[in-house]
Amino acid sequence: MTNVITRFAPSPTGFLHIGSARTALFNYLFARHHNGKFLLRIEDTDKERSTNEAVEAIFSGLKWLGLDWDGEVIFQSKRNDLYKETALKLLQAGKAYYCFTSQEEIEKQRQKALENKQYFIFNSDWRDKDPAAYPTDIKPVIRLKTPREGSITIRDTLQGDVVIENSHIDDMVLLRSDGTATYMLAVVVDDHDMGITHIIRGDDHLTNAARQIAIYQACGYAVPSMTHIPLIHGADGAKLSKRHGALGVAAYKDMGYLPESVCNYLLRLGWSHGDDEIISMDQAIKWFNLDSLGKSPAKLDFANMNSLNAHYLRLLDNDSATSKTVERLRQNYNVSKQEVIYINQAIRSLLVRSETLLDLVQLAQIYLVDSPIIYKQDAKEIIENCDKDLIKQVIENLNKLKQFDKESVQNKFKEIATHNGLKLNELMKPVRALITGMTASPSVFEIAEILGKENILKRLKII
């Protein structure tokens, strides 16, 4: 397959939805697999709802995911002259017509059909009228003259052939009375003008496909290959909504997910390559095809996503993991150079206990010796109920240690536990709570070796 050109065409009316990100990913992978082009089009014809902030959210979301597009971004708001020109050509060819029917009249017809329990298709009285009858005091819309007979077949690579009778397709508006193009016309003109060969999008667009094909045919354009993929659902099987969790790509970034894991997870939501779960971007480009798309809605599962993210976290080298951790810590703390060194020394033990960057950041706070330690509630309770004399004994013994490496510290704690008739883990519970502010953490002996005697004693003396 040669000269493949795909596109991602979001509307800038909010954040970059996770479902839209998957659509972008599939288009990106298909284009890259065939050494083709992946284009970006911003469908901003809805002036009231489109915002610059949403456009920036789309750009930043795609860049964060690593989905780089080819060429310049196309903005529909800057192309109305082309759409208008196309509508006028259809008018001159007798494939479109001026319609002067008001919205109020159309609504009356709709209500009448509802009352009679009839399927409503607007039939304009102006479809075949002589131009001599046109009123001069009303600005008309331009409507497509949809064929009344026959049918349109959507040849979908995933859904199969979907046949829609022309009698169920209305004479849709192409150009509004103010001269601006409708979404339907703009999409078709853009896809043709941009040379789009393959349209891959959510199956919520399937109902639009027949209407768009009617415009393609009227314009004499070749219809691109179409693939309508099932939408993402929540774990309960219902259509994805806010109650199922974060919906925007930026939210997943804020929640501590890595772009590599998000791409891997989205890829597996509706596409498969045998039993492979861990798939790098390079592998995805090599393997991606439309034949392996699923026909059933995929379910968003945070447990699987967390597991994938943990895998990708552990692939990070020490410096990269430290850098990502410190970057987030600095949103709330002044992190010193020495504290960065501590975190870097501890990073491997932190990574194996983390599923997200948020987990990593929380554990890394143990090594912020210049900031007050934050005690979790269960750690507070252990500290409040512990044997204060025992902690004083720990302080005295550790203070005498000349070597403060992991092994020496561990041996000293074993000695203290035996002397007091305690199991080692019984002794370590209050010690861990005091040193880390937590009840579960990396090895206290490792923490002691990294932070050194002075910092450890300082935390123990808080009691």
From Swiss-Prot:
It comes from the Bacteria. It is found in: Cytoplasm. A motif ('KMSKS' region) lies at residues 239-243. GO terms for molecular function: ATP binding; glutamate-tRNA ligase activity; tRNA binding; zinc ion binding. Gene3D superfamilies: 1.10.10.350, HUPs. Its main location: cytoplasm. ATP binds at residue 242. It catalyses: tRNA(Glu) + L-glutamate + ATP = L-glutamyl-tRNA(Glu) + AMP + diphosphate. GO terms for biological process: glutamyl-tRNA aminoacylation. One of its GO terms (cellular component) is cytosol. A motif ('HIGH' region) lies at residues 10-20. InterPro entries: aa-tRNA-synth_I_cd-bd, aa-tRNA-synth_I_codon-bd_sub2, aa_tRNA-synth_I_cd-bd_sf, Glu-tRNA-ligase_bac/mito, Glu/Gln-tRNA-synth, Glu/Gln-tRNA-synth_Ib_cat-dom, GluQ/Sye, GluRS_core. Its EC number is 6.1.1.17. Keywords: Aminoacyl-tRNA synthetase, ATP-binding, Cytoplasm, Ligase, Nucleotide-binding, Protein biosynthesis. CDD domains: GluRS_core (cd00808). Coiled coil: none annotated. It holds the Pfam family tRNA-synt_1c. Monomer. NCBIfam families: gltX_bact (TIGR00464). Belongs to the class-I aminoacyl-tRNA synthetase family. Glutamate--tRNA ligase type 1 subfamily. Catalyzes the attachment of glutamate to tRNA(Glu) in a two-step reaction: glutamate is first activated by ATP to form Glu-AMP and then transferred to the acceptor end of tRNA(Glu). This is Glutamate--tRNA ligase 1.
